[in-house]
Amino acid sequence: MLTFISKAQQIPITSQPLSNAYLYNPAAAGVQGYIDITLGGRQQWTGIENAPRTYYLYANSALGKNSGKDFSYLSLPVSNPGYYNQLAQSKPKVKHAIGGRVFADSYGAFSESGIGVDYAIHLPLKEKLYLSFGLGLQASNFYFDRSKAQVLDAFDPSYDQFLSGKESELLFNGRFGAYIYTDKLRIGYSINQLVQNSLTGETSASAYQGQKIHQFGNVSYRFDLNKIGLTPSAAILFAPHSPLSIYGGLIFDYNRLFLISAAYRNDESIVFGIGFTALKIFRLSYTYDFPMGDVQKVSSGSHELLLKVMLNRKNASDE
């Protein structure tokens, strides 16, 4: 029981990392050209008792309008008073963004629920090219359900000491991220769980029970071919004492309304997805992870459903 948790990823895994960039990286807040409200859920390894389940809700948006200051006082009365305003508005400006998230994650006898807030600043490097930095704070409640614990050795002193700890414990943590982006390119890197908290009752035999730093990186680029869009992407998640998670995928969409996707994850699973956009503000997408290798013998796969609401979306190219 303790071994399983010690070697598991401690932040949720998603099969839609491109749509869920903010879930991993606070610097992704405000990258989209709209107010992004996302609700998602994932059932992993269907068919396995007490398999991981994840639910999340988050929202993020840039603040204010991307407009310049009033420079008309620099113009002589006989000239064009609006010239300097037009010039100022044509230049990219520093942007600020905020975001918030709630989540619930369960895996076997352990569950975690939490809430987080994030801030990001977006610095213009050149026209349409931005570099953003983000910081986030998070409060998480960890719960251990003794009734679901399966122990091979009931007289294990490490397990007895772990049981002497709290069933429920509140921990605080933080995260940091950076993002480079244009209207087509996305490159991100983030560090989650900056504080390596320990759980009460943790022993040297369960040294990885506490929160560990998780590093996440992603890259994607969109190619527009008339009404057809092709977006190859890759993501990597690294955590101490856990297998390296590598994701590579391709999204095909028509007129940004309908999409299909395929991806491969190095944990021996192939991912297939479909999605559509309705009324220009709602996007519903579903992915199925087809297991391969030994997992296929005990699981029928993983399912993930995501609903995105895109408010104040100026045009269809805002992604």
Place the predicted regions along the sequence by residue.
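Sec/Tat signal peptide C-region and signal peptidase I cleavage site
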Residues: 4-8
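Subset of outer-membrane beta-barrel
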Residues: 9-319
